[in-house]
A protein has these predicted regions:
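Intrinsically disordered, low-complexity regulatory regions enriched in serine/threonine/proline
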Residues: 3, 7-29, 41-43, 48-202
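Acidic, metal-coordinating catalytic segment for phosphate/diphosphate chemistry
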Residues: 34
Length: 202
């Protein structure tokens, strides 16, 4: 039932989404673009793509948060990039960074603004909600989700892209599609270099 609703584009705010469903939404938006660029799907549970360049592999993948989807605050995912000598996600890498490392200042500003817009649209739980009736630390931790990000993200921020409904996932995927093309283009150039790139792990 959930997958049928997802394919019809009818996931609404607060409606639980599994990571597999999130990956399917993203895949529908980006797969043809990267297939045309010579990328193949990686193995495993996460949504990833790889391309062999000489004896190197350029890889990128999407990874949902390990925390379960919350009715009020949704969930998050990140995007990671890797240049390695094998096609396995998370294998020993020559270069590996999450998305923030490669973003421009304008992109960082946009993502910060987008996160704040999503937070503004999140419903607040009733006073009898379980997490609000635990310790003060847990209550503060949960309510922090509703506080606006005051400082613009930077290249060292571990950016997690929040979603509370299917619309958010689609918008993130559309926004990052061309950014990912730019980043993998840089990694492809490194892979085509005659000399082995310096090892850089982020």
């Amino acid at each position: 039932m959930q997958i049928k609703r997802m394919l019809n584009g009818t996931f609404n705010a607060g409606e639980k989404m599994k990571s597999t469903e999130v990956y399917k939404i993203i895949n529908l938006i980006i797969k043809e673009d990267f297939k045309a660029l010579g990328y193949k799907k990686t193995k495993g549970g996460m949504l990833g793509f790889y391309k062999q360049i000489n004896k190197f592999y350029v890889i990128f993948w999407f990874q949902c948060s390990q925390s379960a989807f919350n009715f009020y605050t949704g969930s998050k995912f990140t995007i990671e990039f890797q240049l390695s000598e094998t096609d396995g996600i998370g294998s020993e890498a020559i270069e590996r960074h999450r998305i923030s490392h490669y973003l421009t200042q304008e992109e960082l500003k946009y993502i910060t603004k987008k996160e704040n817009e999503i937070r503004k649209n999140m419903k607040k739980p009733p006073s009898n909600y379980s997490l609000l009736n635990m310790s003060d630390d847990i209550k503060k931790w949960f309510m922090k989700n509703y506080e606006p990000i005051r400082d613009v993200y930077n290249n060292d921020t571990d950016i997690l892209l929040r979603y509370i409904e299917e619309k958010n996932i689609k918008e993130w995927a559309e926004y990052f599609k061309n950014i990912i093309k730019r980043i993998v283009g840089v990694l492809e150039q490194k892979a085509m270099s005659q000399e082995r790139p310096l090892i850089v792990i982020g």
